């Protein structure tokens, strides 16, 4: 019996037993490729002939190559080509083959047969062959004790018959007590006596494959229809059959699992080229697996960092989105040019103020100078020109976020400076022209250009001849200040800047409210100090007067975790509860 159990453990036990080998060969013919089994024994025969020094080994090697390994006539295509090609080259050149010339092919064939053996052990053919062999060995007994054993079997059979007769006689005596005792068995075992007659217990060992328990099965019982309740009822119905089988068959056993060679204990042959190559391939495979694992971990960490950096709310994105993206970005060269223009404007303003002539209330001018300055001297139409010159260009205002409101004083100061510079630059036409005449530079054009009132072209009339072209004008002052004001507009927060908020959560405070539908709305805003009710509503775009807001505060008497405080004043400071501002909308 122990020899038969070895069939399931290893391939060598099957190949060394004739009965198991015949069953294995029949299974290969039916379900797989039997030529690899023939090649295995042919290689063993060649190695034995080579060891004994028989001359027939050369003829056998040619037969093995032509029948199994040849690319044209061979039937073992699964063997790699680099194992078969050297053997064919040596046979074609008439070179004598070594004793271990088929060793690489033999190793490949053994691995193939081991995989087939694992499938063969789980087949019905293997179980039938195992039961057949077990029954024949159980019936075979030594010849000297045949008469004694037959006498013992006769005695056992007669004693068994008398015991069954006595049991039948006892069972026929029906009493009230016996019926009460057998009531449960009669109701739960209905029809089992007929089933026993149809399927009597066999006198052969019951062999099955090793499987897991019902609860640990890989197949779902609910999917297959075999629920635990149904399994329990089925077990109760057929329990007596299993008990009868166990009593009749004392040799019931479970087949052992297939033994697999451990990879950890594999020894590498570093003395041969193939052994070193296999060792290098194994090391490379492990290193590549480790590199892939490291790359995967790095990619996951990068994704987590990106998620942490992008932790900003929708309100921050809406407030930080710039409405006019056509203005472009300001690089360092533009900032340097702007600084030089402003510096030159300031210097030219100082120079033009020193060279400007006295007004009508000042000292009288000389006759020569007066004749030269009569063409561009301010007239009674100067107020109209001044009105056209200092006209502030209209610009569409876009909504800004809360950080822009903190700079309103600075914007007001910029607008005031713009008005003052425009008023100072209005009379620069006459002063500049007079200075040009005194310095003997190119004279200014004497033709007066009249533009319609309110036209923007009137502000662009300035002299562009000579070095004095850098003299200030309403157009240059207005354009430079307007350019600076656009830079202030572009300083509004953008989503890229808000993405850095997630790195420093200490600068944020969490505010939230619970709506009438019991859905919480949460956001994170910069912690700039105490917050008022108006700022809280502005963050969530809540309308005024629609609902009342109750804010969480610490309970005064300590009877509850918190209490709700109704706040109606828009300028009232909100309480902070557990590091956040929480409210309920009612």
Swiss-Prot record:
GO CC terms of this entry: beta-catenin destruction complex; cell cortex; cytoplasm; membrane; nucleus; plasma membrane
Gene3D superfamilies, alphabetized: 2.40.240.130, Regulator of G-protein Signalling 4, domain 2 (1.10.167.10)
Keyword Transmembrane: no
Protein name: Axin-like protein pry-1
Chief site of localization: membrane
GO-annotated biological processes: anterior/posterior axis specification; anterior/posterior pattern specification; axon guidance; canonical Wnt signaling pathway; cell development; negative regulation of canonical Wnt signaling pathway; negative regulation of vulval development; negative regulation of Wnt signaling pathway
Encoding gene per record: pry-1
Polar residues compositional bias, start-end: 151-168, 368-388
Annotated stretches, region: Disordered: 137-168, 344-442, 478-501
Species this protein is from: Caenorhabditis elegans
């Amino acid at each position: 019996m122990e020899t038969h159990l070895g069939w399931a453990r290893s391939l060598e036990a099957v190949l060394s037993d004739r009965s198991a080998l015949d069953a294995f060969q029949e299974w290969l013919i039916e379900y797989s490729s039997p030529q690899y089994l023939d090649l295995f024994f042919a290689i063993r025969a060649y190695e034995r002939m080579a060891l004994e020094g028989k001359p027939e080994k050369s003829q056998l090697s040619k037969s093995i190559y032509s029948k199994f390994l040849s690319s044209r006539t061979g039937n073992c295509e699964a063997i790699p080509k680099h194992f078969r090609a050297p053997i064919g080259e040596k046979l074609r050149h008439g070179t004598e083959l070594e004793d271990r010339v088929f060793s690489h092919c033999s190793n490949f064939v053994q691995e193939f047969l081991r995989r087939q053996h694992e499938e063969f052990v789980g087949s019905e053919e293997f179980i039938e062959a195992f039961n057949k062999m077990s029954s024949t060995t159980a019936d075979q007994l030594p010849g000297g004790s045949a008469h004694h054993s037959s006498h013992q079997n006769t005695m056992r059979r007669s004693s068994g018959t008398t015991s069954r007769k006595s049991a039948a006689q006892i069972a026929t005596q029906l009493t009230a007590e016996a019926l009460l005792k057998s009531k449960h068995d009669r109701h739960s075992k209905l029809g089992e006596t007929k089933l026993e007659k149809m399927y009597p217990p066999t006198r052969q060992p019951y062999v099955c494959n090793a499987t897991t328990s019902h609860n640990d099965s890989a197949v779902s019982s609910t999917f297959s229809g075999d629920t635990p309740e149904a399994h329990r009822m089925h077990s109760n119905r057929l329990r007596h059959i299993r008990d009868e089988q166990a009593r009749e068959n004392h040799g019931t056993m479970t087949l052992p699992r297939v033994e697999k060679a451990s990879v950890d204990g594999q020894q590498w042959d570093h003395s041969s080229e193939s052994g070193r190559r296999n060792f290098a391939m194994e090391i490379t495979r492990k290193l590549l697996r480790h590199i892939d694992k490291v790359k995967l971990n790095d990619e996951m960490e990068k994704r987590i960092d990106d998620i942490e950096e992008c932790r900003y709310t929708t309100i921050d994105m809406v407030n930080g989105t710039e409405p006019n993206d056509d203005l472009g970005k300001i690089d360092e060269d533009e900032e340097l040019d702007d600084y030089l223009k402003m510096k030159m404007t300031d210097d030219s303003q100082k120079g033009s103020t020193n060279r400007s002539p006295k007004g009508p209330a000042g000292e009288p001018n000389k006759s020569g100078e007066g004749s030269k300055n009569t063409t561009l001297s301010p007239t009674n139409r100067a107020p109209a020109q001044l009105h056209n010159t200092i006209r502030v260009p209209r610009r569409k205002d876009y909504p800004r976020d809360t950080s822009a409101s903190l700079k309103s004083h600075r914007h007001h100061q910029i607008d005031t400076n713009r008005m003052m510079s425009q008023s100072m630059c209005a009379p620069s036409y006459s002063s500049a022209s007079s200075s040009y005449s005194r310095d003997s530079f190119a004279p200014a054009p004497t033709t007066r250009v009249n533009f319609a009132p309110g036209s923007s072209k009137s502000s662009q009339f300035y002299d562009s001849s000579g070095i004095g072209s850098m003299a200030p004008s309403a157009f240059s002052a207005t354009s430079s200040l307007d350019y600076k004001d656009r830079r202030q507009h572009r300083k509004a927060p953008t989503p890229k800047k808000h993405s850095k908020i997630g790195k420093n959560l200490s600068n944020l405070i969490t505010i939230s409210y619970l709506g009438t539908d019991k859905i919480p709305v949460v956001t994170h805003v910069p912690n700039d100090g105490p917050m008022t009710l108006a700022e809280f509503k502005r963050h969530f775009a809540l309308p005024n007067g629609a609902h009342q807001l109750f804010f969480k505060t610490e309970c005064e008497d300590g009877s509850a975790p918190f209490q709700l405080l109704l706040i109606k004043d828009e300028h009232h400071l909100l309480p902070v509860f557990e590091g956040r501002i929480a409210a309920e909308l009612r």
